[in-house]
Amino acid sequence: EMGLALSSKQEAAVYAAYRHSLSIITGSPGTGKTTVLKTILEVYRRLHPKGEIVLMAPTGRASRRMAESTGFDKARTLHSGLGLGSEEDDANRNRKQEPLSADLIIVDEFSMVDMWLADKFFSRIKDGARVVLVGDPDQLPSVGAGNVFRELIDCGLIPVTVLDQIFRQSKDSLIAYNAKFINEGNTKLYFGPDFVFMASDNQAEAAERIIARYCREIAESGIDRVQILSPFRSEGAASAEQLNEAIREVVNPFRSAEEEIKIGVKVFRVN
């Protein structure tokens, strides 16, 4: 009825969410995690029309994206859902210790959750509730202490479904496929219109080509749809800091008639 055809692993992820009180769904971008979440939500609402569902994510941006992608408007941040970070009055302190009323809790981007926040979260789950943790274990771990998501995956006590078939990608696109190969340590990559390798003899030459390509791309696609990633932070002409400075002078050069504010190494200009 939903018009969805699930792969065998997507079906396994949905079944695990109902067979176990705690389950994990992992996969890189484009492997159908959102489709699985939509299915879990739809099935749960049909089986338990009076059940309470809560979607959570570590950040506001992730929770908004979760709400938009699933069509479920009650997504919130973990801090908000747990009542953390607000005024420490007596009533609020008492409320923080009460179990969450939700019957089904789905947390996205769980790789970003550290030990402290994970402890706060798991201590609030009521008996009988179902919890589904979703994320990409290959992303950078949380800023705070602990690689919680990876430890939960590796503990061997929680059912884990690994989604590895790429769906969210144009038929002719090579980006997601090559990302998967790189992650697996496979150096045999495929090249085409959207995945190109350009060799340079040094960082200065690379920076010059990067800036020229960037200017062409933003002229064609718009500045919000183009991004540069660098493996270097500050060392060399192709580092993030030096590329940012060079691109700023091309895209938004200094104009004496317009206001400029400099705070430390950051420069703020009109436009």
Task: Walk through the language-model features, giving the residues of each.
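N-terminal pre-P-loop "Q-motif" helix
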Residues: 4-19
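Residue-level marker of regulatory loop/turn positions in helix-turn-helix DNA-binding domains and
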Residues: 6, 99, 110, 259-260
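Conserved helicase motor core of P-loop NTPases
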Residues: 16, 137-266
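P-loop (Walker A) phosphate-binding loop of NTP-binding proteins
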Residues: 17, 28, 58, 231
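Conserved helicase motor core of SF1/SF2 NTP-dependent helicases
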Residues: 24, 35, 39, 43, ...
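Conserved glycine(s) of the Walker
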Residues: 32
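A generic structural signal for residues embedded in beta-strands
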Residues: 269-271
